[in-house]
From Swiss-Prot:
Name assigned to this protein: Aurein-5.2
Lineage: Eukaryota, Metazoa, Chordata, Craniata, Vertebrata
Subcellular location: Secreted
Tissues of expression: Expressed by the skin dorsal glands.
Domain of life of the native organism: Eukaryota
Example of a GO biological process term: defense response to bacterium
Recorded GO CC terms: extracellular region
Annotated keywords: Amphibian defense peptide, Antibiotic, Antimicrobial, Secreted
Length: 25
C-alpha cells in the first residue's frame, strides 16, 4: 500500500546514507 511505498523510499534513502558506495538501482 501507500505506507509500503513510503517505507521503500525511506529505506532506499537510508541505504544510500549508510552505504554510499552502493550504486542506486
Amino acid at each position: 500500500g501507500l505506507m509500503s511505498s513510503i517505507g521503500k523510499a525511506l529505506g532506499g534513502l537510508i541505504v544510500d546514507v549508510l552505504k554510499p558506495k552502493t550504486p542506486a538501482s
